[in-house]
Amino acid sequence: MTRPLNALLCAALCIALPACAQSGTDTATQASLGERQLALEEHDGRCALVEPGQAGLDLQLRWPCRFHLDREGGLRTRQVGENRVLLVESSEKVPDSQDCRTEIQAVRTHGNGLEASKAVSRVAACPPFQWDEKVFIGLFESRP
């Protein structure tokens, strides 16, 4: 009696474990910024940054996009004056090449809201990549 029960239990675990492994949150499209819970979503083929209870912030990046992460997989941010700045990136492989077309847009805290940079940086590099800290500042100082 215990052999069939063990076999049934093993079969159930083989089915359930992969499902559990896939059910975690996607850290590349969901992040915490202090008390804020942020998510990236697709709006008409473009990326939008959404926060519960707030209006969505439409970005200039194509979907899919992701938050720029540090080496440990957490949201990489920089403090610039009174504002916290994060980066959102969208990347696609260049056909017949090892390069990618990557676009980066900065988003900063602004009072109780969020503000996206008007400028977007375009680079030929594939994520994951640790963008220079100047990118966090420069996208707000540049003109589009």
List where the protein language model places each region.
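Bacterial N-terminal signal peptides that target proteins for export
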Residues: M1-L9
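Bacterial N-terminal signal peptides
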Residues: L8-P18
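Exposed acidic/polar residues on beta-strands and adjacent loops within beta-sheet cores, strongest
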Residues: C20-P144
